[in-house]
Every structure is written in C-alpha cells, then in structure tokens.
C-alpha cells in the first residue's frame, strides 16, 4: 500500500504514516456492524492525485472483503501546521 500511495502522491515512502484505530459503531442506540473509514490528512494536491489515492485506498480495502469503505480527505494548511520533535 505505502509504495503505491507514495508513487501516486509523489513523495518518499517515509513521509506516509498509517494509523489503525478500532472503533465501535452505534445507530439508534444499538451497536451495529461498522465499515472502514479512511481519513487522509494532507497538504493540498491536484484533483487527479486525490482521485488516484482514493482509488488505491478503495481497491485495497475492498480487496480485503469489505463491501463499503469511506475515504475522507482533509486539507492541511502549511501556515497552520506545526510539528515538533525532541532532539
């Protein structure tokens, strides 16, 4: 997955971080079966790149047997992004 995404985005593989968070889904006060929700936080890319990344994620998740997947993109802004690393 990482090599495909890095190629589509045009970035080094080590720029990409995946987080797997297990969730419970509820509707009408009852627990219901869930589905994968893939959230992508990134700096703005072209529509073509976004579409390609969505396709890669869709194909990967559905290839694992899930009939439904949501892919949600959130655009980050350079002037509002802070990253700190202790030396």
Give each language-model segment a name:
Residues 1-87:
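Interaction-mediating elements
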């Amino acid at each position: 997955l990482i090599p495909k995404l890095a190629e589509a985005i045009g970035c080094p593989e080590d720029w990409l971080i995946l987080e797997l968070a297990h969730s419970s889904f509820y509707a009408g006060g009852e627990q219901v079966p869930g589905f994968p929700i893939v959230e992508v936080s990134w700096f703005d890319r072209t529509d073509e790149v976004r579409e390609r990344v969505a396709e890669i994620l869709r194909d990967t998740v559905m290839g694992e047997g899930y009939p439904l997947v949501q892919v949600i993109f959130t655009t980050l802004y350079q002037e509002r992004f802070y990253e700190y690393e202790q030396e």
